[in-house]
């Protein structure tokens, strides 16, 4: 089934070229089907790239989704045209009186700051509080997951000596959890972060369950409130070349950046990346949408 997006959204052309089923709002409104309302709070500076990554995954399900893109009103985005935000994005103030079936809170390149130092932290806290009573299930990604764990449960983040950067093997820690339906015992996911949350802190919170972690990369998947809150510390949504672009960007800036681990063939940046996370990335998002959004949400929000 399709995702419903604005007919002029630039990501639409990319998705159609990849045979991702998209539908315009005009076409959807002629169908007698209630689409799931999904909000994406896009905190990334590379907004259009992140749009395509997430829409690619949530569009690969049998569900019809009405997608609403959100940006932070209290933060000035310097890497995206204001025209793009005006045309395709809303703010929390625009939607705070609505209810949503699902919400995705993305990562953000602010993890070396304390949460309180982030210029939009107060606005983000209001959105996370709103999600507890107005959203059926919220999926938090990377820094968004760290922010959610801190705000809702007081779980701290800690600086790493070196950036966690690459594609890492993870192990399923809980069996018979719907979010992991169809997962192999071992699976891969990308990570790109300078901070971590610790397994010991997660296990001290009785409302949280650790679902998957990595010996090298640490905590990856955590669930809370019986699935109303999902936290993914990795980046299962990443495209095949995202880590490559991050590596080349930092290298060209003269930063001391290592080659992402387990990513390029033979760990040689002149070789093509090896994509080993795509199937489980699709599975993660489809399981979240099916079991924690579609199966749990009321017909009338």
Swiss-Prot record:
Record carries keyword Transferase: yes
Q: Pathway it belongs to?
A: Amino-acid biosynthesis; L-methionine biosynthesis via de novo pathway; O-acetyl-L-homoserine from L-homoserine: step 1/1
What the entry lists under Pfam families is as follows: HTS
Instruction: Name the consequence of residue 142 to A/S.
Output: Lack of activity
EC number(s) stated in the UniProt entry for this protein: 2.3.1.31
Question: Which residues of this protein are annotated with the site description Important for substrate specificity?
Answer: 192
Which residues does the Swiss-Prot or TrEMBL record annotate as the active site?
A: 142, 235, 237
Consequence of changing residue 47 to M: 17-fold increase in Km for acetyl-CoA and 14-fold decrease in catalytic activity
Q: Which Gene3D superfamilies match?
A: 3.40.50.880
Q: Which GO terms describe its biological process?
A: L-methionine biosynthetic process from homoserine via O-succinyl-L-homoserine and cystathionine
Q: Which reaction does it catalyse?
A: L-homoserine + acetyl-CoA = O-acetyl-L-homoserine + CoA
Task: Give UniProt keywords alphabetically.
Answer: Acyltransferase, Amino-acid biosynthesis, Cytoplasm, Methionine biosynthesis, Transferase
- The disulfide bridges present are none
Q: What does this protein do?
A: Transfers an acetyl group from acetyl-CoA to L-homoserine, forming acetyl-L-homoserine. Utilizes a ping-pong kinetic mechanism in which the acetyl group of acetyl-CoA is initially transferred to the enzyme to form an acetyl-enzyme intermediate before subsequent transfer to homoserine to form the final product, O-acetylhomoserine. Cannot use succinyl-CoA as the acyl donor.
**PANTHER family given in the database record:** HOMOSERINE O-SUCCINYLTRANSFERASE (PTHR20919:SF0)
Q: What is this protein called?
A: Homoserine O-acetyltransferase
Q: Which organism is it from?
A: Bacillus cereus (strain ATCC 10987 / NRS 248)
Q: Give the lineage.
A: Bacteria, Bacillati, Bacillota, Bacilli, Bacillales
- Encoding gene per record: metAA
């Amino acid at each position: 089934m399709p995702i419903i997006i604005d007919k002029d959204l630039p990501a639409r052309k990319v998705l159609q070229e990849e045979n991702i089923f998209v539908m315009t709002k005009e076409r959807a409104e002629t169908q007698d089907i209630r689409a799931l309302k999904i909000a994406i709070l896009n905190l990334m500076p590379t907004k259009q790239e992140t749009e395509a990554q997430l829409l690619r995954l949530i569009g690969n399900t049998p569900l019809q989704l009405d997608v609403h893109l959100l940006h932070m009103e209290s933060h000035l985005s310097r890497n995206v045209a204001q025209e793009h935000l005006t045309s395709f994005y809303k703010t929390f103030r625009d939607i705070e009186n609505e209810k949503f079936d699902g919400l995705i809170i993305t990562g953000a390149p602010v993890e070396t700051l304390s949460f309180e130092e982030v210029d939009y932290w107060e606005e983000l806290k209001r959105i996370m509080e709103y999600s507890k009573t107005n959203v059926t299930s919220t999926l938090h990604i990377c820094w968004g997951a760290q922010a959610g764990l801190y705000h809702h449960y007081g779980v701290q983040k800690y600086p790493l000596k070196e950036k966690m950067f690459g594609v890492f093997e993870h192990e399923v820690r809980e069996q018979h959890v719907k979010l992991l339906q169809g997962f192999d015992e071992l699976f891969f996911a990308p990570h790109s972060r300078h901070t971590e949350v610790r397994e010991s802190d997660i296990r001290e919170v009785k409302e949280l369950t650790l679902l998957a972690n990595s010996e090298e990369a640490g905590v990856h998947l955590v669930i809370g409130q019986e699935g109303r809150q999902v936290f993914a510390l990795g980046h299962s949504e990443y495209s095949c070349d995202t880590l490559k672009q991050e590596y080349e960007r930092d290298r060209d800036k003269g930063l001391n950046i290592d080659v992402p681990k387990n990513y390029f063939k033979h760990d040689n940046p002149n070789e093509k990346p090896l994509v080993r996370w795509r199937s489980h990335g699709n599975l993660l998002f489809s399981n979240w949408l099916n079991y924690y959004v579609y199966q749990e949400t009321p017909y009338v929000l």
